[in-house]
Design a protein with these regions (language model features):
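N-terminal assembly/attachment segments of tailed bacteriophage virion structural proteins
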Residues: 6-145
Length: 145
């Protein structure tokens, strides 16, 4: 039982970083430059929005709190120009979560600048209303060896 509990605890551990995204006019600026290295994965970036004064369900201001039941998705543009979208996920604790997965960093062609654009929804499903924030970027760098 102890080994099973220990394995479960280890599996739930993660590498994470909190970042504030400040929205001004048509520009989104992260609180710091984002980069990782080839082969890095299992990293959760948690983004907090600042100065984005829209409301979800006409009750909650995104600058201070995201409504329970709000969702987000993210469109990703890879260094080679390919674009894909991640499935919508619930917004928890006012944070947008983006996970660096192995498929983003496991190949030489993955090195370079990625662009992320988050879409916020007032609910789940195809009838949910949507607002999009300006894109931000991060870089995958090469290892020394």
């Amino acid at each position: 039982l102890y080994i099973m509990r220990l394995r479960k605890e280890c599996k739930e551990m993660a590498i994470s970083k909190n970042i504030t995204i400040t929205i001004r006019s048509t520009k989104a600026t992260p609180s710091e430059k984002l980069f990782i290295y080839q082969g890095d994965f299992g990293i959760d970036f948690y983004f907090k929005l600042n100065e984005f004064n829209y409301s979800i369900k006409n009750t909650i201001n995104l600058a201070s709190n995201l409504d329970e039941g709000a969702y987000a998705s993210v469109t990703v543009q890879c260094p080679n120009g390919d674009i894909f979208e991640r499935d919508p996920f619930p917004i928890e604790n006012d944070l947008l979560k983006f996970t660096i997965t192995k498929d983003l960093t496991d190949d030489l062609s993955d090195i370079g600048k990625y662009t992320l654009q988050f879409h916020l929804y007032d609910g789940e499903g195809s009838d949910a209303n949507r607002i999009t924030i300006p894109p931000i970027s991060f870089e995958v760098r090469t290892l020394l060896i």
